Amino acid sequence: MTIDSGFNHITVLLDEAVEALALRADGCYLDGTFGRGGHSRLILSKLGPQGRLLGFDKDPQAIATGQALAAEDGRFVIVQRSFAELGAEVAERGLHGKVSGVLLDLGVSSPQLDDPERGFSFLNDGPLDMRMNPGQGISAAEFIATAPVEEIARVFKEYGEERFAGRMARAVVERREKQPFTRTADLAEVLKVANPAWEKGKNPATRAFQGLRIHVNNELGDLEAGLEAALDALEVGGRLAVISFHSLEDRIVKLFMRKLVKGEADNLPRNLPVQHKVFEPKIKLIGKAQFASEAELKANPRSRSAVMRVAEKLR
């Protein structure tokens, strides 16, 4: 567990993820989602003097934590970029095709969720922001204030998997015409009233808030770009480990890996003359999908939805 600004963050699948990378003492590794550094610190503890670790994050608080770690350990560097830009960073550093392993731990961190000022939570009132990097892009409040009702409904349904998306979006637009939304509790209350069928044990604003967060941060677009960039960055034999926290993320990861296990021929027209290697898989899967253990679930209930998939680059 690491502690940051009074908020606890327990790294999910800590040992399992680092073990999945099959670390070499002199290898070069990328932590695409540094967060509060749980995975990075364990990786560094297992690297030798020649080993290197490059961390990525969009969150300014995560960057501050990473800079402190970099000052302590010269083998580590942190950059304030999305892992979707991993390819550009790797190319700038001359590391293309030389990376031994990439770790992506997706979603929002506990410090982000638990700090009301970040605007991610419907349980604790705060400014309606939701941006991983508050200095980049539009906030959730700006989106809610300007988007057409159809776009708001699409975000709730497509990214939040909210079945009452249309009804909830109409309630949001009706209310914003009288008074703009600036606080999370205000939006959560309108969503709560508009949701006619509450799920047992789940706040009625949960899915809509998830949809907003994913949209504001382009999380699924970043994931698709980041997976491609990570594979390109890896050396042959390098490993990619991805931890996802909801079905939309896991579906993208699963389909990406499944496509590469089959090779590229599935995407080509029939009877097209091709070289034999397009039938060869680009990756192999390492074991089955992994989930949090019973012990981890007891220690950290937020790990219940975590699933990790691991692949090794073949060519």
Curated annotation (Swiss-Prot):
Catalytic activity: cytidine(1402) in 16S rRNA + S-adenosyl-L-methionine = N(4)-methylcytidine(1402) in 16S rRNA + S-adenosyl-L-homocysteine + H(+)
Any one cellular-component term (Gene Ontology): cytoplasm
Organism: Pseudomonas putida (strain GB-1)
Its EC number(s): 2.1.1.199
Subcellular location: Cytoplasm
Pfam families: Methyltransf_5
Keyword Membrane: no
Main localisation: cytoplasm
Official protein name in the record: Ribosomal RNA small subunit methyltransferase H
Binding site for S-adenosyl-L-methionine: G37, G38, H39, D57, F83, D105, Q112
General function of this protein: Specifically methylates the N4 position of cytidine in position 1402 (C1402) of 16S rRNA.
Highest rank taxon of the organism: Bacteria
A GO molecular function held by the record: rRNA (cytosine-N4-)-methyltransferase activity
Entry's family note: Belongs to the methyltransferase superfamily. RsmH family.
Keyword field contains rRNA processing: yes
GO biological process per UniProt: rRNA base methylation
Keywords for the protein's UniProt record, in alphabetical order: Cytoplasm, Methyltransferase, rRNA processing, S-adenosyl-L-methionine, Transferase
PANTHER family xref list: 12S RRNA N4-METHYLCYTIDINE METHYLTRANSFERASE (PTHR11265:SF0), S-ADENOSYL-METHYLTRANSFERASE MRAW (PTHR11265)
